[in-house]
Amino acid sequence: MLRLLLLPLFLFTLSMCMGQTFQYSRGWTNGKRSFNAASPLLANGHLHRGSELGLTDLYDLQDWSSDRRLERCLSQLQRSLIARNCVPGSDFNANRVDPDPENSVHPRLSNINGENVLYSSANIPNRHRQSNELLEELSAAGGASAEPNVFGKH
């Protein structure tokens, strides 16, 4: 009696182990089996040929089209940026006369901030004067008391 019960149980266990080994030998994991549940139907029952034929990739068509759109958009953006930067009139320093062309290799690079209004060395006293004028206006208006030491440090 025990032999009749153990024999089917042993055969069932053996068949399950063989089936599991077959699935893992074909590269199936739990995530792949649950994600591609319809792939055996598309492969006409040939479970191992689905990945060889590329039929599992049919589910990624929407991803491919969106990837293509993103790549196309990126290439158009790159082309527009390159075209904008390569316009002949975009170099604002090209028409400027160099004061000492023989002393420096690239005079434009020696004074990068010379043409920038905020960071030019010529405007530093003006900025200090403007901050002092603001301090005087604040103290004359009787607003919030600002310490002169704070403005003097800048």
Swiss-Prot record:
Q: Please give the InterPro entries that the UniProt record associates with this protein.
A: Procorazonin
Regarding tissue, the record states: Expression is restricted to 24 neurons in the larval CNS (8 in the brain and 16 in the ventral nerve cord) and 12-16 neurons in the pars lateralis of the adult brain.
Q: Indicate where the modification Pyrrolidone carboxylic acid is found in the sequence.
A: 20
Sorted alphabetically, the keyword list is: Amidation, Cleavage on pair of basic residues, Neuropeptide, Pyrrolidone carboxylic acid, Secreted, Signal
Q: Which GO terms describe its molecular function?
A: corazonin receptor binding; neuropeptide hormone activity
Naming one, the record's GO cellular component terms include:
extracellular region
Q: Which GO terms describe its biological process?
A: acetaldehyde metabolic process; behavioral response to ethanol; cellular response to ethanol; courtship behavior; neuropeptide signaling pathway; positive regulation of heart contraction
UniProt signal peptide: 1-19
Family affiliation: Belongs to the corazonin family.
| Annotated protein name in UniProt | Pro-corazonin
Species per Swiss-Prot/TrEMBL record: Drosophila simulans
